[in-house]
Amino acid sequence: MKLTSVHHIAVINSDYEKTYDFYVNKLGFNVIFDIERPAKNDRVLMLELDKGLMLEIFIMPEPPVHQDAPEAAGLRHLAFGVESVPEAIKWLNSRGIETGPILMDTNNNINKPVVFFWDPDGTPLELHE
């Protein structure tokens, strides 16, 4: 077997309207499908960016809270590539999305700027040049 790509990433959120507004209206993801699953008491949004990254969001009432510190095993954050972190920060801020400070990724002498921001349920998101 040979793995060829990451097909999608799945996260859990609690509020449909806030999640839809954040990922679709503010970040520009396209909706692939949006279905309610009454038997599971949830809703599933499958979203995609132009370059093929798919994000599957399960929206359910009162999901377990994301543990931030001490860090837990599992998904730590999602990172998206951008051409310019400072320009991306301006773009996010113009849409009402707060960001953290610009940090420098010094791993392996990369020395590229990164910034974190959070989705409506606190999932850490990173922008990386």
Task: Cite the ranges covered by each PLM segment.
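Mid-chain, well-packed structural core segment of small domains
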Residues: 71, 78-86
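Vicinal oxygen chelate
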Residues: 2, 89-129
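Exposed loop/turn and edge beta-strand positions of beta-sandwich/beta-sheet ligand-binding modules
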Residues: 5, 41-43, 74, 111
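Core segments of cupin and vicinal oxygen chelate
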Residues: 11-54
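Conserved beta-strand in the GNAT
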Residues: 56-58, 126
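A short, acidic/glycine-rich surface segment
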Residues: 32-33, 42, 62-68, 101-102, ...
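N-terminal beta-strand motif that seeds the catalytic metal site of vicinal oxygen chelate
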Residues: 1-18, 75-78
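Short, charged/polar surface micro-motifs in flexible loops or helix N-caps
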Residues: 50-54, 62-63, 85
